[in-house]
């Protein structure tokens, strides 16, 4: 209450922050008339002037008013678009490294040009990050015209570019692209064999469009680069055949009065926990699986892989639904993005889940992949020196943005007052009643000429509704993952008179719905294929400008765009995004959600008391329910899910921070090796450490030389350095561990100098680099697999009254130290065994690594497996001597 009184007197923090920016807005406005008089060359020359002033010590903050005024003037000249005052405020918020919450239709894309231009002046590179390739290409071309007009270079990173094109795009002042491409390029760079092959520059400043989608919705999905593993696909088919024979059971909870605790009993062969999204075998189920597969004990350590396959197959059948979680298209299982409803070609679920779904659907099973490099978006974006973002809905997640990314959210006022009317939820008892009511509402509003955007949460629901409308003769468009090709066109025309558009989730984000329709797109569609396209386009444009202007008046009279949600999402933010499609730039509009007690949100997270009250109210079929208690139950259910998902994301980053530290160490070492300047010193230090370890192990400080482990010392020394220890001409009384250490070091140093003389210093340096990189990469790959196994079982430590997170940190650190030890051991063994070879043999070793193409993957999804490398030279067998001349088998050397 006290806080409310203070807010009324002094205004909220957001209002006070906005007030502080008003003088800057006025300053920018005062420069407008002066800049209007400048010629094209003079305006573009301002960029050179600003860069000169920066070089002389000026700060970006001091240049902000002039830079923003220059961008505003360029926008007027190039695009015919003038930045509103609220857009200038949005640009300032982005420059300060904060999140600007701006409602749909307020021109977020144009806002980004202000902060991007200002922060591009130091020439360190600005990344503008969007959610898909279409928006990245569109914005790079559309908004890039402003930047190019002012003398800046603009690049665009989309799927399918080669390394040369990517490097050119990253070298530009401003680079547009998707979050996936930026993240994968970072991982790929850290697998390169030359610094010249790196495509990215150091990460300086990023503006993330739809920041909530990328930093929150996608945060639980790590980026993964993977290569093929050696697992067989046959086991997936074998296990898949038995899953349909299992019967789904229930969890029955009862109260044990003697101990005062809840007791759970399980029926059937497996049970499903929809809240946790897990499926588990019951005791009867385990016995049945053992009988069907012909194994004695499914939980025997020897059957651990089989158990994993059974669990994944059970999950594929019980939890993953066709046309909801995935679609089958052209003989492939394609994931559907749960937040946008878009298909995600190339992405695959990890841990064999994707293969289990492929077996379930009877399509070809792609080989399972092994992780070679991975990072979460959370840790990737935290590497930027400065990070900012834009979205229409961030305030509900302000705490998470602050805690995880240290980003504050500022709500930017709309240019015109919001005129949308958000009506109360209408709740029905069953899905059937709900959809019948939805159809009646659509028919009534369609007859009145009001455009309607219907939001569904799955492809299945959108097609059910489409079928019902077709039967009633209502013309409509369906926009879901199956019909995504026409997305921009369908969304752009969703504001036409009487238009009915059914869209899964937030498909179409980034394209404004213009009341009356978009004359440009209509004209382009009509003139396509004409004999004289330019003349046809001009003629069609005049026609459709008149048509759309008239339709806009009719639509405004009918009440503007009507948003009809058919189910609440787990997150209030996603619901707000759907509502936000109506009421852009002060236009009228309305929104309403139709719900049923069979909706997943209420069924899984809603209180059982809701259904009880429904029965007591005796509501007749087809009648909606409006009850304060039920509305409150919906709000509570959403808050529960949001809190649950926040905990998962927080939990994920705490675990990933451990890997992040290790990843930074490995990637920093790779960069040092690629620099190559300190390589001889690095190898000398590694060799000294190894000799010290041997002496410390077999020549204890307080024991007599005759008690030393001479046989083991000789064996270990030979294993490492490919030579026996030289005889030591020293009386036994003078022999100490220190004397032994110096003797062995001198012997190894002498042999190393001989090797360098054999190879010549340049070849030796090159060889050291290749050996180190090759060994680091192979060991890091194995380490990632070990960490995956550690993660899988770490939760069980809780049963031993141990903190799983602390145990994970400790064991991950031990695994890391073991990996570093193996790297040292392997590179030294190879260096002392490698035979004198021609310089081109060493080059060939490096070329073989370069040619090894790795498939890109995303867990949440992994992409398809890497194709075999096409070799120019004769293929080497795994057990043949390695052609590099090390003396080792190929599989133990370059074939790792």
Curated annotation (Swiss-Prot):
It catalyses: ATP + H2O + cellular proteinSide 1 = ADP + phosphate + cellular proteinSide 2. The keyword Hydrolase does not apply. The keyword Nuclease does not apply. GO terms for cellular component: cell envelope Sec protein transport complex; cytosol; plasma membrane. One of its GO terms (biological process) is protein transport by the Sec complex. ATP binds at residues 87, 105-109, 512. Residues 858-886 are annotated as: Disordered. Its cofactor is Zn(2+). It is found in: Cell inner membrane; Cytoplasm. Zn(2+) binds at residues 882, 884, 893-894. Belongs to the SecA family. This is Protein translocase subunit SecA.
């Amino acid at each position: 209450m006290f806080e409310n009184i203070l807010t009324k007197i002094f205004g909220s923090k957001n209002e006070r922050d906005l007030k502080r920016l008003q003088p800057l807005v006025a300053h920018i406005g005062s420069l407008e008339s002066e800049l209007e008089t400048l010629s094209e060359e003079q305006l573009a020359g301002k960029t050179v002037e600003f860069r000169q002033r920066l070089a002389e010590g000026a700060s970006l903050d001091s240049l902000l008013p002039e830079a923003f005024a220059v961008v505003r003037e360029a926008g007027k000249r190039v695009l015919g678009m003038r930045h509103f005052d609220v857009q200038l405020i949005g640009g300032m918020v982005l420059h300060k490294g904060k999140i600007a919450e701006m409602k749909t239709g307020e021109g977020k894309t144009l806002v980004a040009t202000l902060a991007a231009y200002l922060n591009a002046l130091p020439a360190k590179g600005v990344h503008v990050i969007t959610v898909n390739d279409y928006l990245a290409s569109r914005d790079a071309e559309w908004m890039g015209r402003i930047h190019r007009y002012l003398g800046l270079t603009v690049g665009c990173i989309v799927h399918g570019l080669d390394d040369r094109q990517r490097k050119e795009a990253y070298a530009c002042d401003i680079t547009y692209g998707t979050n996936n491409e930026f993240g994968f390029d970072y991982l790929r760079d850290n697998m390169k064999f030359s610094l010249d092959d790196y495509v990215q520059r150091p990460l300086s400043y990023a503006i993330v469009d739809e920041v909530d989608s990328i930093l929150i919705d996608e945060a639980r999905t790590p980026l993964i680069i993977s290569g093929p593993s050696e697992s067989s696909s046959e086991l997936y088919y074998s296990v898949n055949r038995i899953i349909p024979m299992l019967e789904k059971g229930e969890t029955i909870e009862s109260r044990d009065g003697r101990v005062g605790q809840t007791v759970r009993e399980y029926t059937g062969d497996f049970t499903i926990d929809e809240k946790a999204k897990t499926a588990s075998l019951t005791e009867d189920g385990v016995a049945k699986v053992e009988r069907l597969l012909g194994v004695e004990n499914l939980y025997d350590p020897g059957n651990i892989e089989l158990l994993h396959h059974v669990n994944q197959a059970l999950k594929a059948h019980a939890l993953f639904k066709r046309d909801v979680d995935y679609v089958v298209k052209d003989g492939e299982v394609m994931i559907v993005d749960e937040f946008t409803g878009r298909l995600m070609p190339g992405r695959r679920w990890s841990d064999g889940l994707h293969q289990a779904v492929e077996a379930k659907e009877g399509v070809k099973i792609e080989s399972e992949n092994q992780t070679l490099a991975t990072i979460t978006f959370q840790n990737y974006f935290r590497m930027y020196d400065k990070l900012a973002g834009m979205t229409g809905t961030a305030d509900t997640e302000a705490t998470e943005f602050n805690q995880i990314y240290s980003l504050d959210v500022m709500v930017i006022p709309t240019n015109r007052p919001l005129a949308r009317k958000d009506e109360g939820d209408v709740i029905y008892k069953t899905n059937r009643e709900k959809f019948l009511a939805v159809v009646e509402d659509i028919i009534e509003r369609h007859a009145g000429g009001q455009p309607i955007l219907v939001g569904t949460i799955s492809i299945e629901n959108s097609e059910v509704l489409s079928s019902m409308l077709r039967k009633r003769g209502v013309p409509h468009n369906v926009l879901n993952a199956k019909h995504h090709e026409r997305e921009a066109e369908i969304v752009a025309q969703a504001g036409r008179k009487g238009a009915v558009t059914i869209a899964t989730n937030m498909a179409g984000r980034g394209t404004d719905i213009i009341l009356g329709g978009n004359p440009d797109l209509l004209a382009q569609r009509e003139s396509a294929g004409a004999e004289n396209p330019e003349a046809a386009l001009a003629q069609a444009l005049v026609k459709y400008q008149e048509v759309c202007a008239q339709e806009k008046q009719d639509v405004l009279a009918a009440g503007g765009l009507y948003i009809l949600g058919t189910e609440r999402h787990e997150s209030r933010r996603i619901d707000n995004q759907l509502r936000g499609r109506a009421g852009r730039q002060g236009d009228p509009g309305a929104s309403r959600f139709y719900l049923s007690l069979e909706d997943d949100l209420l069924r899984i997270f809603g209180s059982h008391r809701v259904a009880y009250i429904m029965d007591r109210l005796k509501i007749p079929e087809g009648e909606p329910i409006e009850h304060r208690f039920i509305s409150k139950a919906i709000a509570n259910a959403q808050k529960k899910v949001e809190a649950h998902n926040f905990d998962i994301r927080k939990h994920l980053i705490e675990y990933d921070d451990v890997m992040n530290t290790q990843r930074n160490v490995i990637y920093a070492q790779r960069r040092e090796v690629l620099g190559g300047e300190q390589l001889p010193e690095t190898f000398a230090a590694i060799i000294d450490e190894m000799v010290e370890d041997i002496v410390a192990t077999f020549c204890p400080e307080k024991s007599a030389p005759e008690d030393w482990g001479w046989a083991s010392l000789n064996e270990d020394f030979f294993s490492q350095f490919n030579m026996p220890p030289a005889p030591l001409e020293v009386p036994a009384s003078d022999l100490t561990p220190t004397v032994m250490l110096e003797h062995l070091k001198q012997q190894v140093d002498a042999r190393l100098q001989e090797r360098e003389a054999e190879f010549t210093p340049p070849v030796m340096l090159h060889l050291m680099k290749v050996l180190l990189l090759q060994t680091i990469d192979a060991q890091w790959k194995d380490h990632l697999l070990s960490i995956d196994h550690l993660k899988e079982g770490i939760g069980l430590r809780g049963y031993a009254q141990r903190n799983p997170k602390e145990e994970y940190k400790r064991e991950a650190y031990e695994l890391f130290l073991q990996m570093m030890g193996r790297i040292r051991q392997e590179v030294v063994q190879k260096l002392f065994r490698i035979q004198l070879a021609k310089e081109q043999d060493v080059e060939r070793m490096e070329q073989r690594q370069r040619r090894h193409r790795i498939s890109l993957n995303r867990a949440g999804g992994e992409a398809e497996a890497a194709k075999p490398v096409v070799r120019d030279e004769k293929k080497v067998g795994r057990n043949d001597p390695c052609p590099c001349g090390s003396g080792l088998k190929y599989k133990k050397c370059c074939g790792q």
